[in-house]
Structure formats: C-alpha cells, structure tokens
C-alpha cells in the first residue's frame, strides 16, 4: 500500500528552495538584459518581486493562477471578482491562459504595463506603514463621535 510522507514541512522547504533557485536564474537573466540595465535598484527590486511571487505561488509549480492572484489581492485589501481576475491575467499573459509565469510577472513589474501590480505592491507597503497605535485609545469629545 501507499506510504504516508510525514516530512511535509521538510519537503515543502526543499520545494521552496528549488523554486527560489529557479527564480534566481530568471533574475540573473533580467540583470544581464541590456533593456533593463538603466533601471537603478534593479537587483533590490528583483529580490522584492521574487519574495512576493514565492509567497503567492503556493503550489510551487512556477505559475500564479487565478486563485493565487485572488488570495494576493484579498490579502492586500483589494478583492476582485472572478471576471476581473480573468481579465487581469489575460492582459498580463497576452491571452495565453489562466496563469502567468515569473518572467511575465517581472516584465509586467518592470515594464510600462505594470500599473496594476505596482499599485498592488504600493498598497501593501502603505498597509505596513500604517501600524496600529499601541496603548489605550485616545479620549474623544462628544462632538467627535459619529
């Protein structure tokens, strides 16, 4: 009969390490590409994009599908309908299917058409900046109440 793999976490770690290796190779191609050589901070941007991509490529197959994109946008506080997501992926992948690869993701982030994903990452940065205040809440006057 079948054996049960009790090392799920270890296997997942290996999968993520392999994935990171593949993404690093793609990053190297972009760093060597003369088209992007004028972009300052390119290596820092590529590292940030790699981390984001790995976070949402949950199955580790190298592509972000519609459900991963949906999760990404919901986490960022900009949930989209299934139809909007399909349109977004179609625009990004040039109509080639319901997923997009890391290299397409990078071209989109570094190119002119990157408005949507840049906006997504910008929202996430803003969310980090607006940390919740600690301590007891400030007292309000009656006139300030809704």
From Swiss-Prot:
Modified residues (N-acetylserine): 1
Annotated GO biological process: actin filament bundle assembly; actin filament polymerization; cellular response to type II interferon; inflammatory response; phagocytosis, engulfment; positive regulation of G1/S transition of mitotic cell cycle; positive regulation of monocyte chemotaxis; positive regulation of smooth muscle cell chemotaxis
PROSITE patterns given in the database record: EF_HAND_2
Annotated stretches, region: Disordered: 127-146
This protein's GO CC annotations: cytoplasm; cytoskeleton; cytosol; lamellipodium; nucleus; phagocytic cup; ruffle membrane
GO molecular function, one term: actin filament binding
Protein's membrane topology: Peripheral membrane protein
Residues bound to Ca(2+) 2: 99
Residue stretches making up the EF-hand domain: 44-79, 81-115
Cellular localization per UniProt: Cytoplasm, Cytoskeleton; Cell projection, Ruffle membrane; Cell projection, Phagocytic cup
Pfam family, one: AIF-1
InterPro entries: AIF-1_EF_pair (IPR049025), AIF1/AIF1L (IPR042433), EF-hand-dom_pair (IPR011992), EF_hand_dom (IPR002048)
Binding site for Ca(2+) 1: 57, 59, 61, 63
Tissues where the protein occurs: Microglial cells in the central nervous system and dendritic cells and macrophages in several organs.
Keyword vocabulary terms for this entry: Acetylation, Actin-binding, Calcium, Cell membrane, Cell projection, Cytoplasm, Cytoskeleton, Membrane, Metal-binding, Phosphoprotein, Repeat
Keyword Phosphoprotein: yes
PTM annotation (N6-acetyllysine): residues: 10
Residues with Phosphoserine modification: 38
Task of the protein: Actin-binding protein that enhances membrane ruffling and RAC activation. Enhances the actin-bundling activity of LCP1. Binds calcium. Plays a role in RAC signaling and in phagocytosis. May play a role in macrophage activation and function. Promotes the proliferation of vascular smooth muscle cells and of T-lymphocytes. Enhances lymphocyte migration. Plays a role in vascular inflammation. Has a dual influence on glucose-induced insulin secretion: inhibition at low concentration and stimulation at high concentrations.
Quaternary structure and partners: Homodimer (Potential). Monomer. Interacts with LCP1.
Protein name, as recorded: Allograft inflammatory factor 1
Source organism per UniProt: Sus scrofa
Encoding gene (name): AIF1
């Amino acid at each position: 009969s079948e054996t049960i793999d009790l090392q799920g976490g270890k296997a997942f770690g290996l999968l993520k390490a392999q994935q990171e290796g593949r993404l690093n190779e793609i990053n190297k191609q972009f760093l060597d590409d003369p088209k992007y050589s004028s972009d300052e901070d390119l290596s820092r941007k590529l590292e940030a994009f790699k981390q984001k991509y790995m976070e949402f490529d949950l199955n580790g197959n190298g592509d972000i599908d519609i459900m991963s994109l949906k999760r990404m946008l919901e986490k960022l506080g900009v949930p989209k309908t299934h139809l909007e997501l399909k349109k977004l992926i179609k625009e990004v992948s040039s109509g080639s299917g319901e997923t997009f690869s890391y290299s397409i993701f990078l071209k989109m982030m570094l190119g002119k058409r990157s408005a949507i994903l840049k906006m997504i990452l910008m929202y996430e940065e803003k969310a980090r900046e607006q940390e919740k205040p600690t301590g007891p809440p400030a007292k309000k006057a009656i006139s300030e109440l809704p």
